[in-house]
């Protein structure tokens, strides 16, 4: 009888020790709403809101030589997902947005072209990729479900602006989620350049009424853009200005007097970082 009691006590002590060891090696992380939080491999978090914490492990593989794949392999339970990229951050992050928790995998990109992947655990316990934002997760700000990050502009030259995103939930397809851009009508640029040619600036986008004609040699300000088709240009004092159309396949050309010209042939002082 004594041996049985002793055996039971030993078994209980071992079980408690194992549980404590697990707790020490697998801490439970509870991210705050809207706060990007780094998570160590082996930590646990309730990813799908079922009240149970899932253990998260990940493996990061970077190869500067390009001889092998560069990736992050996520494992949650028996589910695995590999995200490939250019140069991956050594850490994975957590972000809770409107009570939904996401794993963020960050790729530094080929040339300061960051990309953050949003991974979630669906209702069936499978890891899914909701899409990505071309921004560093550490620079992201979340306000009422809107995620704002600093992204690279796409028109004319190398510049950056804040961009807004939300994560849409498609309940018609089993609750699949998708990162969606919320375009703003105007993004600030603020670059001072010098005109190389005479440039008519229009009072309205798509209009034919000229608001201001810039002369070759004039100093002007690229005030802002919709980052798609139009750039607003002002005089050096910022008092008068008008719209200039973007042209070309890659958004680095401008349309001047109906003619498509390279942006570098229109303005001196454009910045390019690649």
Q: Where do the protein language model's features map onto the residues?
A:
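Short aromatic loop motif centered on NTY/YTY
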Residues: 89-121, 125-191
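Positively charged n-region of N-terminal signal peptides that target proteins for export
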Residues: 1-9
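A short beta-strand motif characteristic of beta-propeller blades
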Residues: 29-33, 80-85, 131
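Acidic, glycine-anchored loop motifs typical of Ca2+
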Residues: 45-56, 97-104
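Bacterial N-terminal signal peptides
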Residues: 9-17
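Beta-loop motif signature
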Residues: 184-237, 256-274
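A short macromolecule-binding patch
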Residues: 238-251
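Sec-dependent signal peptide cleavage junction
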Residues: 16-28
């Amino acid at each position: 009888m004594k041996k049985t009691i002793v055996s039971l006590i030993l078994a209980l002590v071992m079980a408690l020790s194992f549980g404590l060891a697990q707790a020490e090696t697998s801490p439970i992380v509870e991210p705050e709403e809207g706060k990007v939080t780094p998570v160590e491999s082996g930590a646990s978090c309730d990813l799908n809101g079922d009240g149970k914490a899932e253990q998260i492990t990940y493996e990061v593989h970077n190869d500067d030589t390009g001889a092998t794949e560069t990736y992050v392999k996520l494992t949650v339970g028996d589910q695995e997902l590999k995200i490939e990229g250019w140069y991956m951050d050594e850490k994975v992050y957590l972000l809770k947005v409107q009570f939904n928790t996401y794993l963020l995998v960050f790729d530094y990109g080929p040339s300061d072209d960051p990309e953050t992947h949003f991974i979630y655990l669906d209702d069936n316990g499978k890891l899914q990729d909701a899409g990505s934002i071309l921004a560093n997760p550490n620079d992201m700000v979340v306000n009422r479900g809107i995620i704002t990050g600093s992204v690279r502009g796409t028109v004319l030259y190398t510049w950056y602006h804040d961009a807004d995103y939300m994560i849409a939930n498609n309940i018609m397809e089993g609750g699949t989620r998708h990162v969606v851009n919320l375009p703003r009508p105007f993004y600030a640029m603020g670059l001072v350049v010098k005109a190389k040619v005479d440039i008519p600036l229009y009072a309205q986008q798509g209009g034919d009424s000229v608001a201001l004609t810039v002369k070759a040699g004039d100093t002007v300000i690229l005030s802002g853009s919709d980052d798609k088709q139009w750039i607003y240009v002002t005089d050096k004092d910022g008092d008068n200005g008008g719209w200039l159309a973007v042209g070309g396949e890659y958004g680095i050309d401008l349309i001047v007097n109906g003619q498509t010209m390279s942006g570098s042939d229109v303005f001196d002082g454009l910045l390019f970082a690649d």
